[in-house]
């Protein structure tokens, strides 16, 4: 499931932004694995921010435009049960129609790829490995190592 043939290179200055977007999608993935894909429906769009619904569910990591402009329509398609190939096509069109470059473009690509992975039920660890690979060797290795500690901690807490 590779949406994009080429990826922009991530710069060191993109670290926090890319990590925040990756954290956002890992939180969505974790939520959908426990509650099902329709759990995404409780998230509403308000002031360019995806936020929790009135049920008081935990907040997601913060994302802002242009990510919300691309991610929200894709999330709606997934919730509405649109075929994954159609979601992929629309993701490609949304990204092709923008003028973002560098780290911002990479964050959009990372998010679109992640949402398609969430739609098919990919595990959090595989999703993390996918996003880390997209970030490049330096940032990707750092993110993967950070998340491996989180995953290991979760597993220890479940035992």
Model-based region annotation:
Residues 1-159:
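Large intracellular
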């Amino acid at each position: 499931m590779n949406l994009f043939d080429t990826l922009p290179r991530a710069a060191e200055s993109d670290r926090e932004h890319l990590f925040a977007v990756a954290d956002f999608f890992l939180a969505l993935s974790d939520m959908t694995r426990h509650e099902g894909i329709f759990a995404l429906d409780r998230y509403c769009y308000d002031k360019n921010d995806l936020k929790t619904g009135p049920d008081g569910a935990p907040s997601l990591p913060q994302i802002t435009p242009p990510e919300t402009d691309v991610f929200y329509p894709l999330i709606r398609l997934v919730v509405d049960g649109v075929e994954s190939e159609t979601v992929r096509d629309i993701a490609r069109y949304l990204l092709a129609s923008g003028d973002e470059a560098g780290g911002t473009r990479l964050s959009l690509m990372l998010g679109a790829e992640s949402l398609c992975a969430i739609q098919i039920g990919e595990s959090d660890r595989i999703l993390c490995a996918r996003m880390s690979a997209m970030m490049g060797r330096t940032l990707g290795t750092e993110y993967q190592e950070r998340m491996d500690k989180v995953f290991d901690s979760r597993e220890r807490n479940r035992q």
